[in-house]
Amino acid sequence: MKGFSLVNTIVATFIFTAVGFALLVMSDEGFRITKSSINANIAEANAVYALNTALEHLINGGNCEGSASGSVNDGSWEYTLYPTPSGQCFILASGRKDNAVRYKIAYAGFSGGGGLGALTINYLKGDEFSLQGSSKISNGGTNCPAVVYYEKKADIEYKGNAKIEGGIVNKKINIPSEIFKEENAFEDIKTYYKELYEDRFNNVSLPDVPLTTEDCTLEVGNSDCSLKNNEINCGNTKLTVENCTSVLIKGGKISLNINNGELDIPLVIESDELVSLTTVGDTSINDIYVITKTFGKLETGGSTTINGNVVIKADSFKNLGEDEQNIVLSGSTKVEGGMYISTQDSSLPSSGNEAKIKFAGSSEIGENFYFLGYGVDLHYTGGSGISGNIYIKTYHEYELDISHYGNFVGGSIYANCVSSDCEGEVEIHNGNLKPAEGSEFVFLSEGKELEAELKSGSGGLDGYFVNLSDNGELKLEIKAGGLEANGLFIGNKIEIEGGEKEKLTGSNKINGILVGKIVEGLKLGGSAEINGLVAALEEFDELNLKGRSKIKGMVIGNILEGSVSLIGNSEITLDFETINSFISKFGLEDFFKTLTCESEKGSGNLTLPQHLVGSIY
């Protein structure tokens, strides 16, 4: 039976009545133990056994009612439980051996909430469990415990004014059944977001490429072309498009420059390689369709307006160099429709180069952005934005790099990479990535890594971050400033990164629901905060808080391998209301239980220390 050293200490300490039978008899030969003293000692041991059996019954969730008895040490034991008006449980335990009888009387306190505390860990394996300065672990004024554990290696050490506010419960917790509605909810959450993503992504229809008549088609081989005043010039070949409903340039390696040009019909380019498509000045085009084996570069500037969609079907993207992008929208470029990028046959390539895309200046996309390909690096700066949704599906990697204040996307984001070694990354520099009302941001990875990184300044990101892989990692890297990461964070392994010593520092915050099998980096400093649920279904590496840092909600896990240390004014405070509000906000009611401290009078979970009245001989 585990966790009763404290009980036995109390039993030994608080004996207040003694001497029933003579324990030792003096003789000329010295001390001689009589049969009566042996029976008395056995009865005493049996009474302790009865008390511990009663406590074990309560610790394992038994009600404060009824009685039990049995045989032990060639004698007997018995206990009876009586609920009290205060909600405590009165224990009358007895042990017998022949004519010797001993009694133990104790009161046990109770708390509700399924025995969950601000810090709930089954196995505390570290060599240190210390609270220093004015730090504290608190039940938040509820009738829940502050600390719940099953086994711990180190005694709790207090220095200064540090304290634990609330009871300490010794009980083993089944973590999934306490926080989830179903035991396999952790995997169900992954499945739910994978299916949600697939439903949203697969429902996007790409615009059809218009059919172009032969007299509006220009076949040019390898050529540098230009467009001006409804006339396309490719070397010695020209085409006037006044009577066309669309125009097609068809060839090998094609470049097209549009300078202050106007084309009020769709432009279609079919090529082995699009070397470049450039617009400058006051340029207006209806739609752009590019169908090519290799895509080089599309660059817009000035006051370019595309009155419809930009559709790119490219089997591969050319590597133009480390600092060069394949697509650049800058100046006051406006795409009234959407931007759709995929392979020619809409399959997902397993090799190639990532597409590098940059939206800068005050460029805008009026509808959706869609990408299907090997990989994409999407970079937003300035006041650029997308009014619609973002849909991304890659084989190898995707990266959203945002340096932008305000909401740069008006709709939702759905992003995923599917190979076993793929990486998804969202990186924020002095900006915000927060969905508008009624929208949602879903970032997934089926591979080794999904990372959310907030680098500098102020701002933050909201969303659902789920690594779907059984071997994948979710990284939260928040480096400096007053930054916030808000949302649902799910992964086989979750790692919090930031400073060199403390992983979450400054006034940075993580708000929401964070659940992993393994969670690393719970090292907070400064005035950093985590608000909500932090759960490790298998293991935490350590728990360290300094300064004025705090965790408000609950930290719950099966194993904590390293030390538990709170220093300064740091604190861990139980707050189910905060957790439940995030469960509701993120629509997770189908997976998570509503946590509460409410309990019926006379029932609940045992809180140590017990209040022993004494032993009766």
Swiss-Prot record:
Keyword entries, A-Z: Membrane, Signal, Transmembrane, Transmembrane helix
A GO cellular component annotation in the UniProt record: membrane
Endpoints of the signal sequence: 1-27
Bilayer-spanning residue ranges: 105-124
Membrane topology per record: Single-pass membrane protein
Compartments, as annotated in UniProt: Membrane
Primary location class: membrane
Domain of life of the native organism: Bacteria
Keyword Signal: yes
Protein name, as recorded: Uncharacterized protein aq_1439
Species the sequence originates in: Aquifex aeolicus (strain VF5)
